Amino acid sequence: YMIDEANIESHGMMFHKDETLANYPDWEVPFMQRMSRMIARDRNYSAIVTWSMGNESGYGKHFETLYDYTKKIDPTRRVQYEGGGYNSKSDIYCPMYARIWRLRQHVNQRDARPMILCEYAHAMGNSVGNFQDYWDLIYKYDQLQGGFIWDWVDQTFAIKDENQRDIWAFGGDMGFVGVVNDSNFCANGLIAADRTPHPHIYEVKKVLQYIHFEPLAFTPNKIKVTNWHDFIGLEGYTLRWAVECDGKTVQDGEMDFPKIAPRHSANIELPLKALPADGKEYFLTLRAFTKHEAPLVPKGHEVAIEQWELPSAPSAKTVQPVEGTLTVDRNNETLTVKGNNFQVA
């Protein structure tokens, strides 16, 4: 599914109602041209489900004109605009970088519109640390419908530094060319400019996986599997499981998933053997892999992973008696306990 966005952005003109271009009469025609030409070009692409009127351009009467025009010529699609906020001229509430409390707030108020974050999870450097917290809410409430990570790829280029080392360059690295640059703020992607994955993309992959695993209480060999796909079952995937202790695999196996319809769950029993009562920690790791090759996805590609500690009986520990006696000294200010080789006051 795609949201098609008009090339309307005037971030530098601020967002005040008296400064935004969206209220300047001279800019009404350019606004309309960019919106109408985009729709005329792309309206027959069925993957487009929503038209966006632009980005970071404040809010003004020109956006109200664009909304009414778009709904008139294409009543089949939704129309959104980030700067519209809770104004009526946006079918979707689509803020950027909303805090998690705002997601809860939207669900709890009476506005029935879906909420989609037009930008969130700013992926610059060691980032997306609270990504799971967002998706715990999104999975919980149908009204919360995801968002768009800013952004996908670092916008940098390869050059040699003064020591002839390869580096990724940005901003002023190209030398003074008479224009303002934003330093390294263009390097905020999930992948590098050469499409090498950054470490934090694996956090995103984990959170967005379509197969979810949960432990079932009091039954360590049974798990709950949820299929979050919209259209397909899990017949095309293989489940591999392993029990690990001290970093070593002590049990493992492979099995097919049962038939689980899209957006449905099922309980699965794993052939786990009883764990020894040795007081050690045992962890169950679950992985799902593709059975067949598909466009862009090879056979055997890992699509989901989960891990949790298994309940196990503690080892019987013998309490060794301690020789010697304790003495207690008490005065008006302190209480002192003394024993062999120690003192506590």
Task: Identify what each model region corresponds to.
Residues 1-224, 228-249:
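Extended substrate-binding grooves/exosites of carbohydrate-active enzymes
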Residues 221-223, 239, 253, 268-270, ...:
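Hydrophobic residues positioned within well-ordered beta-strands of beta-sheet architectures
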